[in-house]
Amino acid sequence: MAITYSSADELGNTTEGFLEIRENTSGGWKSARLIIVVQMAERFAYFGIASNLIMYLTGPLGESTAAAAANVNAWTGTVAFLPLLGGFLADSYLGRFRTIIISSSLYILGLGLLSFSTMIPSHQSKDSNQLQETIFFFSLYLVAIGQGGYNPCIKVFGADQFDGNDHKEARDKSSFFNWLMFGNCISILTTRLVSTYIQENLSWSLGFGIPSVSMLLSLFLFLLGTTSYRFSTERVGKKNPFARISRVFMEALKNRRQPDLDIANANANETLLLLAHQSSKQFRFLDRAAISCELAEIEEAKAVLRLIPIWITSVVYTIVHAQSPTFFTKQGATMDRSISPGLLVPAATLQSFINLSVVVFIPIYDRLLVPFARSFTQNSSGITTLQRIGTGIFLSILAMVLAALVETKRLQAARDELSIPMSVWWLIPQYVIFGVSDMFTMVGLQEFFYGQVPSELRSVGMALNLSIYGAGNYLSSFMISVIDKITNQYGQRSWFDNDLDQAHLDYFYWLLACLGFIGFAFYLWFAKSYVYSRSNTF
């Protein structure tokens, strides 16, 4: 049964377009904390698979380093792009709550099949190898489909537990994104320590089975909190938001030859009020839709267009971001990983330092730096989201420069045939800087795309944020394939040779640092001219 405003009032209190099932007790930190725990369980499951995926592909499945890295990037890119479809279905038809439940079920099925695929004997015959690979990749992409609905909706559903019109809850909403990442990083840190050890030292089947149980727990906990949630009523009594925005573009195109006088006379009073706002002075060609569209609908279309330059210029950051679970891990596998005689640190565990740095820095940022900055800027988030994103992009470039320098030193040590290999601890600084970079950019992008899209499109807004990582992974995969082909010609060693001591990851890292710097320059230019679509800029 569709919820109407009259029935909403009978069920509970409606605030900022949200339905409270229990008046004065629904939503807020009580519900948000549960959602943080729910996603912690999901992140444990996802990174229990993703963190060590390249080691499984190059190990039991026998793929080359370049092919495995390309497969990881392609899958990660798919995981990041499918939320666009999931967000569309949630915002247009299913709603976030139902989408989370359906996608969680698919997610659990995919993880279960993934664990099953590792039990199939892979070396008995060619047919058994083919069967194992088929089930493995089918289940891997079923997990991606589950992620497509789950990931954009759970974050938005958590943020929706706060009323943006209430000053205190608006600050809490900004803080929610920080603590969501804090919880996620604790979970990711745990799974990288536990799951990767089990996978490499005990059993891949058990190592992939534990994430299945974790995701089952996530769904159970989410359903447990049903009566305490606020549910969005933004779409009640309104047209499909995609249809509204599409209509604006179509009408603007149809009226492109209409005299300006006709446009000025359309909804004249409303036009004068809206054009006083700076954001309405951008993309004036869309004002031609005012003859048949409401001015609020035109502003929604403009808000979506303003996101495109920020989306494009953030992609270079995500190309850099794609290297930590692939080449950083393979790089670490060639180094001295011994802690004590007989005890080696799994290479994938090194990624834990990214999460550890986030866990350490987020409380400092949220409790010290944000209040300090807020006293000067009067911004509820301390600094604007674009400033936060830009800081993270700069740090990612710095991390890539450091990675190139360390790899140059590692290659020198390997080619000098030193009796003691270079210690893996040389990689820790680049992981730590990456972690701090993620804390700024990942949270900043979440806040930005949540706050700058029309309120009815927040699932799609979060999906746009995730799709940046998809674009980065796809472009990284494409770059690797092209560079591998070019550098492998005429009998030369590829930059990504299976023997990393003969490869040139240092050249690749320098290339990424240069691309990152160019992208950062363009980002600064677009960010400087960006006009926020709301006074509340998170």
Curated annotation (Swiss-Prot):
Domain of life, source organism: Eukaryota
Compartments, record wording: Membrane
A GO MF label: dipeptide transmembrane transporter activity
CDD domains, sorted: MFS_NPF5 (cd17417)
Tissue specificity statement from the Swiss-Prot or TrEMBL entry: Expressed in shoots and roots.
Positions carrying Phosphothreonine: 99
Organism listed in the record: Arabidopsis thaliana
Family, per entry: Belongs to the major facilitator superfamily. Proton-dependent oligopeptide transporter (POT/PTR) (TC 2.A.17) family.
Membrane topology: Multi-pass membrane protein
BP terms from Gene Ontology: nitrate transmembrane transport
Key word Transmembrane present: yes
Transmembrane segments: 44-64, 74-94, 100-120, 134-154, 175-194, 204-224, 308-328, 342-362, 389-409, 424-444, 463-483, 507-527
Coiled-coil residues: none
Gene3D superfamilies xrefs: MFS general substrate transporter like domains
A Gene Ontology cellular-component term: plant-type vacuole membrane
InterPro entries: MFS_trans_sf, NRT1/PTR, POT_fam, PTR2_symporter_CS
Pfam families in alphabetical order: PTR2 (PF00854)
Protein name: Protein NRT1/ PTR FAMILY 5.11
